[in-house]
Amino acid sequence: MINVVGSASRSFVFPADLPMVYAFYGDVGRLLNYLPHISLVRAYEPDRFRLLYSTTELGTYQIRIFADVQTTLDKGWVIRVHPLEGMPPVKAETGVNSSTAQGYFTSRSAFKEVGDHTRVEYSLQLRAQLPTPLGLRLMPGMVVDRIAASITHMRIREIVDGFIKRSVDAFPYWLAEMENHRSF
């Protein structure tokens, strides 16, 4: 088995006031689309989702990690995405150049007013136990684990940094959409 664990945290200032930023990030179903390498597979309910982390590593190995999550809007301007219990897990599978398993995805966004802007403290974690692809079984386990750890940390940084950029870039379009709905 390959142990996949990665986490990252970032703090950034969003160019809008706190209630507006909280409403924007509270639309989690939309925001999930801004996560690089992660796609929305299914919305069970407006606050419950199945996600898929999918990458091709070392130019050959297709890695797929499914995670069932729910969102919670907490007191104090906090949004949490955390594991959804009770869903049937995806069956772990492996091939010569592929591995699929159920994993866990969590994130936390805390919002704080900074003048006319909002500071966002964002953290994310992904973890899973992947069956070792057949093409990697001849390599020593410690070597595979080190490679997996290095790749996972790189991918998690890409996800967090990409999410921040994509969400900030998408905000004006969301704002225009909200204003159009108000005019009707």
What is the meaning of each model-derived region?
Residues 94-150:
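Beta-strand/loop substructures that line and gate deep hydrophobic ligand-binding cavities in soluble
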Residues 7-9, 62-67, 102-107:
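Short, surface-exposed coil-to-beta transition loops
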Residues 137-184:
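A conserved amphipathic terminal alpha-helix motif
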Residues 44-95, 162:
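Glycine-rich portal/gate segments that line the openings of hydrophobic small-molecule binding cavities
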Residues 40, 68-70, 108-112:
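Short, surface-exposed charged micro-motifs
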Residues 7-8, 36, 52, 92-94, ...:
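Short structured motifs
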Residues 13-17, 54-56, 70-74, 112-114, ...:
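Solvent-exposed residues in well-ordered beta-strands and their adjoining turns
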Residues 1-59:
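Hydrophobic ligand-binding cavity/cleft-lining segments
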